[in-house]
Design a protein with these regions (language model features):
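Short glycine-rich His-centered loop
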Residues: 2-32
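Cofactor-binding loop segments of dinucleotide-utilizing enzymes, especially the Rossmann-like FAD-
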Residues: 8-10, 54, 79, 107, ...
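Glycine-rich beta-alpha loop elements in corrinoid/cobalamin-binding modules
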Residues: 38, 42-169
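Conserved acidic residues
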Residues: 72, 124, 212, 248, ...
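N-terminal [4Fe-4S]-dependent radical SAM core
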Residues: 2-3, 144-147, 153-200
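Radical SAM [4Fe-4S] cluster-binding motif and immediate context
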Residues: 176-287, 291-294
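Electron-transfer interface patches adjacent to heme c in soluble/periplasmic c-type cytochromes
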Residues: 288-357
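Protein kinase-like catalytic domain
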Residues: 139, 215, 241, 300-303
């Protein structure tokens, strides 16, 4: 039997959506939370585990410490804004449960594994980058020296094992919606631009683009684009519809949903019979989504991320006229242009801004 494992998106300051839940850790104008999808994958692989999303479910630090007292392994997804409070929580958990092993995961510890281990003696392991199988192997008792992608202490020194390669077979991973159904209350999740209640998940990992504003590819999933099969995605969506018949929108929170045009069209065709309302995060190149080829009449909202200047891939990609011309009457999109970054040139920002008006 593996160690009894608690996967934790830790409690934080009021209305802060960070750590495991958010691509953009933030306190927003209205209280809103994303799903802790990264923690759901390994949670689905370990018998007896639990995924605790403290911020969205209103679980206090004191309650979290008591819950952690019943587990042998704690996997905490930290963030840069929340790291200081997460250190305090880790020490409190260790005081309550001296035998528990504590693992920190997420972009912050991936970028600064040695510093994080030195700053917090309560941390036993840091799992860098994609941590799904690293966490599972630790829970199953594999020797730390044999686990790829981790940093840890040994004889007073901090050791850094070789990186774990990006996961290629995404179909082998559990369906996160099974873990959501088991451990989470979907009524606790709301995002202003999505219909309520919503459910979010991934169909791909990684992104070859080098956009400076995007967290996951830069510090967690990397730039190697990997995809689930369209059959696997459609199967999970059919099951999710049975789990939650009242869900108003399913959101594919991929770094870039529409990188491969043929796959996008194929997946849209398999989703159409399910009669779902769904949306996705996309590069600002959506002809396959908005044209009749995809037949995705239930594609509700398309966040189109555009960064002017330095990392603009094609100038035409931020021209919205083509979307207006190609989209069907039941399709909606929104753009999120990014401005005032250190990489931007004034002229490029002005030109890009004009094309979005």
């Amino acid at each position: 039997m593996p160690l009894r494992t608690l996967f934790l998106n830790p409690p934080s300051f009021e209305n802060f959506d960070g750590g495991a839940a958010s691509r953009w850790p933030a306190t927003r104008e209205v209280e809103s939370y994303w799903y802790p999808v990264w923690l759901a994958y390994p949670a689905g692989m370990l018998e007896g585990s639990r995924l605790l999303d403290a911020p969205s479910h209103g679980v206090s630090a004191g309650e979290t410490i008591e819950i952690a007292g019943n587990y042998e392994l704690l996997v905490l997804f930290t963030s840069t804004p929340g790291f200081a409070s997460d250190i305090l929580l880790a020490h409190a958990v260790r005081d309550r449960n001296p035998n528990i092993r504590i693992v920190f995961v997420g972009p912050h510890v991936t970028a600064l594994p040695e510093k994080c281990l030195r700053d917090c003696p309560a941390i036993d392991f840091v799992c860098r980058k994609e941590f799904d199988y690293s966490v599972v192997e630790l829970a199953q008792g594999k020797s730390p020296e044999e686990v790829l992608g981790i940093s840890y202490r040994k004889n007073g020194a901090i050791m850094h094992n070789a990186d774990r390669p990006p996961i290629e077979n995404l179909d082998a991973l559990p369906h996160v919606t099974d873990v959501y159904k088991r451990d989470l209350n979907i009524a606790q999740y709301e995002i202003p631009f999505l219909r309520y209640p919503y459910v979010s998940l991934y169909t791909t990992r990684g992104c070859p683009a080098q956009c400076t504003f995007c967290l996951w590819p830069q510090a967690l999933s990397g730039h190697a684009w990997r995809k689930r099969s369209t059959d696997d995605v459609a199967g999970e969506m059919a099951k999710a519809k049975e789990y939650w018949p009242d869900v108003q929108e399913f959101f594919f929170d991929d770094d870039t949903f529409n990188i491969q045009k043929a796959r996008t069209i194929e997946l849209c065709a398999k989703l159409k019979p399910l009669k779902l309302t769904w949306s996705c995060t996309s590069r600002a190149r959506g002809d396959e989504l908005f044209s009749g080829k995809a037949g995705c009449n239930n594609c509700h909202a398309e966040p189109l991320w555009t960064e002017p200047g330095w990392n603009l891939h094609q100038p035409s990609e931020v021209c919205i006229d083509s979307f207006q011309a190609d989209r069907g009457p039941d399709m909606r999109y929104r753009t999120s242009p990014i401005g005032a970054l250190s990489t931007h040139f004034k002229a490029a920002s002005i030109t890009t801004g004009a094309s979005l008006i």
